[in-house]
Amino acid sequence: MNESGERPVIEYSALAQALRKFAAERDWEQFHSPKNLVMALTGEAGELAEVFQWMTEEDSKAAARNPSTAQAVRDELADVLLYVVRAADVLGVDLNAAVTEKLRVNAEKYPVDASRGNSRKYTDL
């Protein structure tokens, strides 16, 4: 529960702490600048995209269950998450607050009655 008594949208503090410990044990804090972490995050997102590159829509929907791609999907999703959490921790960003606020903003940009069933950008609704 947070200060207002609500459950967090996401709970990541244990992961942030584990990543902090992992970096400290290896003396990697010196390399974990925001710039380096974001660059690494971009690389990992690219590796995730590479798993899906040239797949059909149908194949992409089954990628996490397909024995030939499932492990890569899991690994790259995990890498992306690890870098997001580590970057947020280094930058002092409360991901729960950021995600909660972003969900609120997106709900305003994309009201259900105007956006249900279409993929138009909020500026075109």
Region spans (language model):
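Flexible "arm" and connector segments at domain edges
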Residues: 1-125
